[in-house]
């Protein structure tokens, strides 16, 4: 299973990490932290204003790493020989790598090694084939984009070249789909201002609409058509007829 990098804290102080947190973030964005990987080793705080909490990107990452590590059996976690490999984008600089290591330390992971994501991808492929080769790895995640050329020789993988964009990923595709497909439909059918993104009143609406857009985008990976489904009862807006 995939564990999204998301944190959600409800008004009672209960903390959720992963899929439940990500899904709840659409309905209550001020209770959630998402996309903090982009902010690693920056001075940008992550604010959960609904619960009056401010976290650093490293603290957010530590919460996710702690949750993932907790999936292991207790005897494995407590074994001194147990180590953890964390994959990071090829475009991560040394400061971002140091921040990732700091998050791992805060999460109590113990022995940790970092591996560039293209290298990990090639190693995964090589487990299923015997021949060495040169690979072009195109890695687009939720927040980052990397393109790399890697070579496998005798089971060892070397990264020959790489390039990337720290602020380009699936979430940016969501934004483009929203701006060009969903937003025009919302403006045509509901009583909304043109600059709704600048109005805090519509923050939850925007998050719900973006969440629905993402779901449709994922469907398009396997289908030629997808429906963006927006539950009107949760949008909290009136249509053009006033209903």
Residue ranges of model-derived segments:
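Adenine-nucleotide phosphate-binding core of ATP-dependent small-molecule kinases
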Residues: 49-70, 241-243
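Transmembrane alpha-helix boundary signature
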Residues: 46-48, 72-76
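A glycine- and small-residue-enriched flexible loop/hinge segment at structural boundaries
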Residues: 42-43
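Oxyanion-binding/catalytic loops of NTP- or PPi-dependent enzymes
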Residues: 1-39, 53-54, 74-243
């Amino acid at each position: 299973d995939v564990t999204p990098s998301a944190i959600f804290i409800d008004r009672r102080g209960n903390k959720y990490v992963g899929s439940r947190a990500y899904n709840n973030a659409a309905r209550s964005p001020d209770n959630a932290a998402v996309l903090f990987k982009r902010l690693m080793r920056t001075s940008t705080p992550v604010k959960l204003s609904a619960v009056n909490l401010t976290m650093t990107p490293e603290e957010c990452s530590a919460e996710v790493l702690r949750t993932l590590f907790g999936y292991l059996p207790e005897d494995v976690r407590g074994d001194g020989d147990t180590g953890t490999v964390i994959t990071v984008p090829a475009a991560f600089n040394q400061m971002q790598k140091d921040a990732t290591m700091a998050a791992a330390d805060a999460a109590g992971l113990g022995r940790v090694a970092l591996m560039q994501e293209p290298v990990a991808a090639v190693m995964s492929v090589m487990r299923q084939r015997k021949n060495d080769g040169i690979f072009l790895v195109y890695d687009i995640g939720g927040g980052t984009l990397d393109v790399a050329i890697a070579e496998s020789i005798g089971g060892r993988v070397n990264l020959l070249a790489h390039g990337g964009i720290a602020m380009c990923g699936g979430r940016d595709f969501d934004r483009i789909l929203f701006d060009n497909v969903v937003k025009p439909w919302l403006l045509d059918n509901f009583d909304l201002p043109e600059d709704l993104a600048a109005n805090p009143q519509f923050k939850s609406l925007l998050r719900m609409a973006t969440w629905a857009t993402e779901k449709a985008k994922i469907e398009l990976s396997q289908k030629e058509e997808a429906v963006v489904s927006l539950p009107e009862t949760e949008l909290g807006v009136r249509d053009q007829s006033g209903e």
